Amino acid sequence: MMKVMTFRDFYTNLSPSIRSTIFLTIVLLIVIIIISKKLDKYKYTDTPTGIIIILEWLIGGINDMCKSIIGRPYRKIAPYVTTLAIFLFVANISGLLGLTPPTASVSCTLTLGIMTFTIIQMTGIRSQGILSYLKGFVDPNPIFLPINLIGEIATPFSLGLRLFGNILSGSVIMGLVYSVMGFGAIVVAPALHGYFDIFSGFIQTLVFCTLTTMFISGKLPDEEVDYFDTHE
């Protein structure tokens, strides 16, 4: 007789990084719902306090970064970059909670890379037109077609593997410190967590989001035209 797999069996059979991804996604969704409820009651004439100040700082900073790289069309790209930044930073620092960082799994980072790659291609096709976009692969000479294709296809792997390697290395080093030093790790662990989880996690989030914005910017036409508005 076949044994019916329960949700508990399914969940425990998942890898630690996938379990962390599920847990953090649920937590972020709950936090977003709570913040959304708070924002519904917030009036723009009110003096910002608490989480509102943090949100204004975060969204304002990402908007400024996107605007400096992309220009006028930044308004439709910034929400994706903001969502990406929040998930990446929370995932990168999840080691502070004793979790396996989701970004220490190549499946997670490559998925993020493929998502970004899809948006990059959609942006190029939407802004340039399908024929003009495809023509770009044979410029300045058709002989460059293989090189251009390889460079384009390498984008999600470049983004995903860079993030994966940096976060995994930090997790491995922290694991070695705890296994070798035992209780003595409590002396050096705070400083190492500060570097590998917080500092390195922030830097990798910044690098991923900056590269994402730059790749998207590279698909936009040179003219200073907000093509998102003209195509709505």
Name what the model sees in each region.
Residues 1-232:
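Selective transmembrane helix interface/packing segments
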